[in-house]
A protein has these predicted regions:
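Positively charged n-region of N-terminal signal peptides that target proteins for export
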Residues: 1-4
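Bacterial N-terminal signal peptides
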Residues: 7-15
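N-terminal Sec signal peptide cleavage junction
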Residues: 17-19
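Small-residue-enriched, tightly packed secondary-structure blocks
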Residues: 21-151
Length: 151
């Protein structure tokens, strides 16, 4: 866990500055998704947060489903929440490209129920536009790093 936090923290802060400077979504208007994801999990935080979950990638190219797991850290985050999310995946040339480290800057409030949209991008150029529904109590204006691994 400690190794994950340290390995994601430095690039996370640097990417947070880059993402904050580029307010436009990293997907061209009218782009067609190359896949879709669904996942459920949770998040807890007291300054530094931890997120976990399991999900499924639907690859539009081969019309198959691939299970994955995710874990991640956030900075400037407080609270806890259950998360259900779905999203569109862009720039996916093969299912293996989903695996990797993703970064994003997010802001949100969950008081009993909430939701948000975030763009996550990995080192292979894969972008996930994630729509999440949350339940719990959580306040965040945070830099996030997430690691996704195909099972």
């Amino acid at each position: 866990m400690r190794k994950l936090i340290f390995s994601l923290a430095a690039p996370l802060l640097l990417s947070a500055v880059a993402v904050a400077d580029d307010a436009a979504p990293p997907v061209a208007p009218g782009a067609i998704p190359s896949g879709y994801v669904w996942y459920s999990g949770g998040s807890v935080a007291v300054g530094i947060g931890y997120t976990w979950g399991r999900g499924t990638l639907y690859n539009s190219k081969d019309q198959k489903q691939y299970p994955f797991k995710l874990s991640g850290v956030s900075i400037a985050d407080v609270g806890g929440a259950g998360i259900n999310a779905e999203g569109e995946v862009y720039n996916l040339t093969s299912p293996a490209d989903l695996s990797g480290n993703y970064s994003a800057v997010t802001a949100g409030v969950t008081i009993i129920e909430g939701g948000s949209v975030a763009y996550l991008k990995n080192e292979k150029g894969v972008v996930i536009k994630l729509h999440s529904q949350t339940g719990g109590l959580r306040f965040n204006l945070s830099a996030n790093g997430m690691h996704i691994t195909l099972k």
